[in-house]
């Protein structure tokens, strides 16, 4: 690997392979994704794989569903990524992965699950406001808890964050305010397709909602 340039939609890798220099646009976010892709590429090359075919496949790689998955590019040109991060460490990692790719503002939308570790809520709020430019606290899976109390726990560690309980409205707000050089992160639910509220599982897919809000 000669160089790596982060972009809003992935990263451009400059590679030296068998003495020749190649550039490939890897449509994945994060330095760790580049490292993983290059390890896999090395295995293919060691097995006698064709360089041109290998580079073509690298340029078409897709992330695991709900793991820094690019759901849409907004009308303003800002990409929106959906990730399963639902712990302080997970949220910190997702934001850190996106930060080098962000020329403008990094807008983070997230919440915390009900009937789970309450101590992580203010910590997640603190992580979000420390590492994002705009933070929107919303509902995740409140389960049997009062959603407003969960948000209050998060907000205790997130001074300056916006609070929008309805997750769809929170996503729409983020998309509406995203400018061309911004990146939006919708964290917490990833590939989940339901929202658990008072014992009921209501249909809710972050990726689909993002696309509907951006349409």
Question: Which residues make up each language-model segment?
Answer:
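ATP-dependent carboxylate-amine ligase
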Residues: 9, 19, 27-29, 38-215
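A generic structural motif
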Residues: 14-18
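Short nucleic-acid-contacting surface segments enriched for D/E, G, S/T with interspersed K/R
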Residues: 35
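A short beta-loop-beta micro-motif enriched in histidine and acidic residues
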Residues: 32
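A short, compositionally biased
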Residues: 5-12
């Amino acid at each position: 690997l000669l160089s790596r340039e982060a972009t809003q939609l992935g990263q451009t890798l400059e590679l030296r392979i068998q003495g020749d220099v190649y550039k490939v646009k890897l449509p994945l976010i994060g330095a760790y994704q580049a490292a993983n892709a290059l390890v896999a590429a090395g295995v293919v090359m060691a097995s006698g794989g064709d360089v041109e075919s290998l580079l073509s496949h690298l340029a078409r790689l897709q992330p695991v569903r709900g793991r820094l998955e690019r759901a849409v590019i907004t009308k303003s040109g800002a990409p929106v990524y959906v990730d399963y991060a639902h712990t302080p460490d997970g949220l910190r990692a997702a934001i850190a992965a996106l930060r080098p790719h962000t020329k403008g503002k990094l807008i983070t939308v997230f919440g915390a699950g009900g009937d789970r570790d309450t101590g992580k809520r203010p910590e997640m709020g603190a992580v979000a406001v420390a590492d994002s430019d705009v933070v929107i606290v919303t509902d995740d899976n409140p389960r049997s808890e009062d959603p407003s109390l969960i948000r209050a726990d998060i907000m205790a560690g997130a001074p300056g964050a916006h609070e929008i309980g309805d997750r769809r409205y929170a996503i729409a707000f983020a998309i509406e305010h995203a400018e061309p050089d911004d990146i939006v992160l919708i964290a917490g639910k990833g590939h989940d397709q339901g929202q658990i509220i008072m014992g009921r599982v209501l249909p809710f897919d972050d990726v689909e909602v993002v696309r509907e809000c951006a349409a």
